């Protein structure tokens, strides 16, 4: 087992990465201090892993309740969130009750938001079961739900007590979900570590096959990068925005297509290709770097051609973005591989990238 630390002073917490962790009650002991625990999971993950986590909590003498949510991005909304609140209230949960988020990014985001809101804040533990949530969304304290007009527009910063990433859970991931997680892995290399990006290029075939040793290394390095950024800028006042590389375009794709049509990682992957093209148009990265990002994204079985929403519709959707200021869209672009920055861009270049993004190159194919 590998343990990393998210250094946030009194709110610091560990990230445990390894195999066989769901059945390790001692990992939970320091982080579930009250008598009651509520596991929040979904219809897919619950039947696979909830009993194991429940047994660990009961081994610690805790009273445990399991809340099972519908599965999918389309359910990341108020009505689903209220299912968590209903369960907490009916169980008489108090401020020492610990919530345990057992699932992917949707479960983690909603459980964290419920923990931030219930009685103005109760503790929670992240137990991510998808690659995307293990390398990205479980770390950093961003919680929230979607609104029909924009992704993650309603939420709060609420740090978990711990993150427990059991690599064994990745074995049950469908190929599409695994690919979606690879988008965030690639992102971390692109924005912060060119050597890591090159390592992903060399090992992409084995990563696509979910090689456990390589997956553990990818989760570790991605968490190191994200934890380092979060420690410097917890509430996205500046540096943390670089973690949104590909997300301005990606969130527009998700909202424009309807939440759940594209997985978040699929939209981010395509968004990174678009952001790389825009970085190239503005003279920051060379043709080779743009091609490497596109080729690695495609090799990870992610879409590289954007849906045809219309240029004006894309721009309209991107204006509903947390980074936008006074209607001005901000993008995370690359100065070079391994170094990102936030900026506004000329309208003509943005429109050129959007026009190019929907075109299928004759030598490449869109990955469904």
UniProtKB/Swiss-Prot annotation:
Metabolic or biological pathway: Metabolic intermediate biosynthesis; chorismate biosynthesis; chorismate from D-erythrose 4-phosphate and phosphoenolpyruvate: step 2/7
Keyword Zinc annotated: yes
Gene Ontology cellular component list: cytoplasm
Domain of life: Bacteria
Keywords associated with the record: Amino-acid biosynthesis, Aromatic amino acid biosynthesis, Cobalt, Cytoplasm, Lyase, Metal-binding, NAD, Nucleotide-binding, Zinc
GO molecular function: 3-dehydroquinate synthase activity; metal ion binding; nucleotide binding
This protein's record includes keyword Transferase: no
Compartment(s) where it occurs, according to its Swiss-Prot or TrEMBL record: Cytoplasm
Pfam families in UniProt: DHQ_synthase, DHQS_C
EC number: 4.2.3.4
Catalyzed reaction equations: 7-phospho-2-dehydro-3-deoxy-D-arabino-heptonate = 3-dehydroquinate + phosphate
Binding site for Zn(2+): 184, 247, 264
GO BP terms in the entry: amino acid biosynthetic process; aromatic amino acid family biosynthetic process; chorismate biosynthetic process
Cofactor annotation comment: Binds 1 divalent metal cation per subunit. Can use either Co(2+) or Zn(2+).
Residues that hold NAD(+) according to the record: 71-76, 105-109, 129-130, 142, 151, 169-172
Cofactor: Co(2+); Zn(2+); NAD(+)
Function according to Swiss-Prot or TrEMBL: Catalyzes the conversion of 3-deoxy-D-arabino-heptulosonate 7-phosphate (DAHP) to dehydroquinate (DHQ).
Protein family (similarity comment): Belongs to the sugar phosphate cyclases superfamily. Dehydroquinate synthase family.
Protein name per its UniProtKB record: 3-dehydroquinate synthase
Gene: aroB
């Amino acid at each position: 087992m590998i343990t990393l630390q998210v250094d946030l002073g009194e709110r610091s917490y560990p990230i445990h990465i390894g195999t066989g962790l769901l059945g390790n009650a001692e990992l939970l002991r320091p982080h579930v201090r009250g008598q009651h625990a509520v596991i929040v999971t979904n219809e897919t993950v619950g039947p696979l892993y909830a009993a194991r986590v429940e047994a660990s909590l009961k081994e610690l003498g805790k009273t445990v309740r399991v809340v099972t949510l519908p599965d999918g991005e389309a359910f990341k909304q108020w009505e689903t969130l209220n299912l968590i609140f209903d369960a907490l209230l009916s169980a008489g949960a108090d401020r020492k009750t610990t919530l345990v988020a057992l699932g992917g990014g949707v479960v983690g985001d909603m459980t964290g938001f419920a923990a931030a809101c219930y009685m103005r804040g109760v503790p929670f533990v992240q137990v991510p079961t998808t690659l995307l949530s293990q390398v990205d969304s479980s770390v950093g304290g961003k919680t929230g739900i979607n609104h029909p007009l924009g992704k993650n527009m309603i939420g709060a910063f609420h740090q978990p007590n711990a993150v427990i990433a059991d690599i064994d859970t990745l074995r049950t991931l469908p190929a599409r979900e695994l690919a979606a997680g690879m988008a965030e892995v690639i992102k971390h290399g692109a924005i912060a570590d060119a050597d890591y990006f090159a390592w992903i290029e060399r090992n992409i075939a084995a990563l696509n096959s979910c090689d456990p040793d390589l997956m553990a290394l990818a989760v570790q390095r991605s968490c190191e990068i994200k934890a380092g950024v979060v420690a410097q800028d917890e509430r996205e006042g500046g540096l943390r925005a670089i973690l949104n590389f590909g997300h301005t375009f990606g969130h527009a794709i998700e909202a424009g297509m309807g939440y759940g049509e594209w997985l978040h990682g699929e939209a981010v992957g395509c968004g990174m290709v678009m952001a790389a093209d825009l970085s190239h148009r503005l003279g920051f990265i060379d043709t080779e770097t743009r091609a490497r990002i596109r080729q690695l994204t495609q090799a990870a079985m992610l879409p590289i051609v954007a849906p045809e929403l219309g240029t004006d519709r894309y721009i309209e959707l991107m204006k509903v973005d947390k980074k936008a200021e006074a209607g001005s869209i901000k993008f995370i672009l690359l100065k070079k591989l391994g170094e990102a920055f936030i900026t506004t861009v000329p309208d003509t270049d943005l429109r050129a990238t959007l026009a190019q993004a929907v075109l299928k190159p004759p030598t490449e194919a869109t990955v469904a």
